[in-house]
């Protein structure tokens, strides 16, 4: 099958959730299909990206999105009904280039990741199209609007509510232009504002079972280590990091204890959290090493949508997890025996202290969670489901 894939970013390196999801989907689709990958980018692809992706696809095309034209479009974005992020990623010259490629390649099906790329292909009717919503972006934006504070808080809340409303209308409208639709979790599907949302197929993320399996020689920790990972420029992760350090850590009775915030592109707000008890790593070449030296994984996420790769990775690495309902619910498994789910700072602190004092409970919970992840969250099984959806659309 000839598949043309449209991505709003080059899916490497894997420091963002959309990149990680698409990279592993390509990795498992590649052996059996002819894939043309088209990526939007505002700078040339580098050697590492080319090396990582060229072995996965038959052809790799980078569609330049001009910086000056992008900012010119944004000046008029307030007058457009399109979501701001759709305007940001939609470039006229890139669209012409993509349509030329579509006519040259003649794919059996087009796979578009995220609604921000939908304008490029929604009116191209010569080929079946599949849209990966990935997350319910409109719901995520509305949640973030409630957490905007400070001097610019009112302006930020208004802008986020506006974007959330535009995204909701767009998620509903663009539904009609695609033959099939997929999304990351049942929770997110419930938030898609369309009468036929139940027809959206669930394609969860997976986890690399070998890369994140438990190690036979875990790093020796000089003190209990609480780990939180993720792209530290992404607002839901920034908020969770601040919540962990400012609201939860002071209530933890166990001392000494260390918090590690591991992830790329830390904002200044995250860097400012560093202290004698808090380590901010920045980019980590192999994030699995951070799981292997952690005692507990703590994810007090309050914002965002979708299934969290970080939770899958922690559980697969046999790290006991203390999670917010927001982080745990998309897994679709019972919390009993798999994680401790907490809704407020004191319950987080109490759970952390209890687990740190009970290695037997840590081990039992880690084993139970790992078994569930190995059973239900392999990339192979989930990409097989996506492959069948693409085949059905192409017929």
Q: Where is each model-derived feature located?
A:
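A short, active-site helix/loop in glycosyltransferases that binds the activated sugar's phosphate group
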Residues: 47-49, 119-121, 165-199, 268, ...
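Acceptor-binding helix/loop patch of EC 2.4 sugar-transfer enzymes
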Residues: 67, 71-84, 130-169
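Acidic donor-binding loop of glycosyltransferase active sites
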Residues: 179, 292-306, 317-320
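Conserved acidic donor-binding segment of nucleotide-sugar-dependent glycosyltransferases
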Residues: 339-346, 354-359
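Conserved catalytic-core segment of nucleotide-activated headgroup transferases in glycan assembly
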Residues: 167, 172, 194, 198-293
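A short, well-ordered alpha-helix in the C-terminal region of glycosyltransferases
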Residues: 361-376, 382-385
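N-terminal subdomain of nucleotide-sugar transferases
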Residues: 1-62
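Short hydrophobic beta-strand element within catalytic cores of glycosyltransferases
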Residues: 310-313, 320-324
């Amino acid at each position: 099958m000839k598949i043309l894939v449209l991505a709003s970013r080059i899916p490497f390196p894997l420091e963002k959730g959309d990149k990680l999801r698409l990279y592993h989907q390509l990795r498992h689709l590649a052996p059996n299909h002819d894939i043309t990958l088209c990526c939007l980018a505002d700078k040339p692809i580098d050697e590492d990206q080319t090396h990582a992706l060229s072995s996965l696809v038959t052809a790799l095309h980078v569609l330049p999105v001009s910086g000056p034209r992008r900012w010119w479009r944004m000046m008029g974005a307030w007058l457009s009904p399109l979501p701001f992020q759709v305007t940001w990623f939609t470039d006229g010259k890139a669209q012409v280039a993509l349509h030329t490629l579509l006519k040259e390649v003649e794919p059996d099906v087009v796979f578009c990741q995220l609604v921000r790329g939908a304008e490029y292909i929604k009116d191209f009717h010569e080929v079946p199209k599949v849209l990966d919503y990935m997350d319910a972006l409109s719901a995520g934006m509305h949640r973030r609007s409630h957490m905007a504070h400070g001097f610019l808080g009112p302006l930020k809340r208004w802008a986020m509510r506006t974007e959330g409303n535009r995204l909701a209308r767009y998620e509903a409208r663009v539904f009609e232009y695609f033959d099939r639709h997929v999304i990351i979790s049942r929770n997110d599907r419930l938030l898609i504002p369309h009468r036929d949302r139940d027809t959206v197929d669930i394609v969860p993320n997976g986890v690399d079972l070998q890369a994140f399996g438990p190690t036979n020689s875990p790093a020796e920790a000089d003190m209990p280590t609480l780990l939180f990972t993720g792209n530290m420029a992404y607002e839901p992760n920034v908020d969770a990091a601040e919540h962990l350090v400012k609201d939860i850590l002071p209530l933890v009775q166990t001392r000494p204890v260390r918090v590690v915030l591991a992830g790329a592109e830390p904002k200044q707000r995250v860097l400012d959290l560093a202290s004698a008890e808090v380590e901010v790593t920045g980019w980590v070449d192999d994030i699995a090493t951070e799981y292997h030296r952690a005692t507990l994984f703590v994810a007090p996420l309050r914002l965002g949508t979708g299934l969290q790769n970080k939770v899958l990775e922690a559980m697969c690495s046999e790290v006991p997890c203390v999670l917010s309902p927001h982080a745990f619910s998309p897994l679709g498994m019972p919390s009993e025996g798999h994680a401790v789910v907490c809704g407020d700072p004191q319950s987080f602190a109490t759970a952390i202290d209890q687990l740190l004092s009970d290695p037997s409970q840590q081990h039992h919970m880690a084993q139970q969670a790992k078994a569930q992840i190995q059973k239900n969250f392999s990339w192979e099984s989930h990409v097989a489901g996506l492959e069948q959806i693409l085949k059905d659309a192409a017929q």
